[in-house]
């Protein structure tokens, strides 16, 4: 089944491309969600008439995502968790915890936007975490995990100033 993409879809194509997909994927997913149109002559003409509008919407989304990325550029999230003697956490810190900490600091981030390629964080330390705000826009934040016991002497001086960013 040939379809016209109305937005960029990972591993498939970008806005305006005509691609072949399995009929079920096109009929049951892409077309009902408004991500594509069947590639008929009438739909191709409709798309070409709306092409500039769709490209402007895409550019606007990228600009908004870039603004959010700029706001997240220098963010350092400090989280405290119970840990053992070797710095291993009792439990873990995942995307939900990081999203909650960012939301509490006034930055709206959905947990689906946070990417932890190696899984949840299970050790005390500093981690660079990517936040995928748009297909083309990714921000990186620093997540610092400290022990609730207060055994981190080197970071205790900075806690008073960075505590508000949590």
From Swiss-Prot:
The keyword S-adenosyl-L-methionine does not apply. InterPro entries: Ribosomal_bL9, Ribosomal_bL9/RNase_H1_N, Ribosomal_bL9_bac/chp, Ribosomal_bL9_C, Ribosomal_bL9_C_sf, Ribosomal_bL9_N, Ribosomal_bL9_N_sf. It comes from the Bacteria. GO terms for molecular function: rRNA binding; structural constituent of ribosome. One of its GO terms (biological process) is translation. PROSITE patterns: RIBOSOMAL_L9 (PS00651). The keyword RNA-binding applies. Coiled coil: none annotated. It holds the Pfam family Ribosomal_L9_N. Signal peptide: none annotated. Binds to the 23S rRNA. PANTHER family: 50S RIBOSOMAL PROTEIN L9 (PTHR21368). Belongs to the bacterial ribosomal protein bL9 family. This is Large ribosomal subunit protein bL9. It comes from Psychrobacter arcticus (strain DSM 17307 / VKM B-2377 / 273-4). The gene is rplI.
């Amino acid at each position: 089944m040939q379809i016209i993409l109305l937005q960029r879809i990972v591993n498939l194509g970008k806005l305006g491309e005509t691609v072949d997909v399995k009929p079920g994927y096109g009929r049951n997913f892409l077309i009902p969600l408004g991500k594509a149109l069947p590639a008929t002559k009438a739909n191709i003409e409709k798309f070409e008439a709306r092409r500039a509008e769709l490209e402007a919407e895409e550019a606007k989304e990228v600009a908004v995502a870039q603004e959010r990325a700029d706001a997240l550029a220098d963010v350092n999230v400090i989280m405290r968790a119970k840990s053992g003697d070797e710095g291993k956490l009792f439990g873990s810190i995942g995307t939900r915890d990081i999203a909650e900490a960012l939301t509490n600091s006034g930055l709206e981030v959905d947990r689906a936007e946070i990417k932890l390629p190696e899984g949840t964080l299970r050790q005390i330390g500093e981690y660079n975490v990517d936040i995928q705000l748009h297909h083309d826009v990714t921000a990186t934040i620093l997540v610092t995990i400290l022990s609730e016991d207060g055994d981190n002497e080197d970071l205790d001086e900075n806690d008073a100033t960075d505590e508000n960013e949590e």
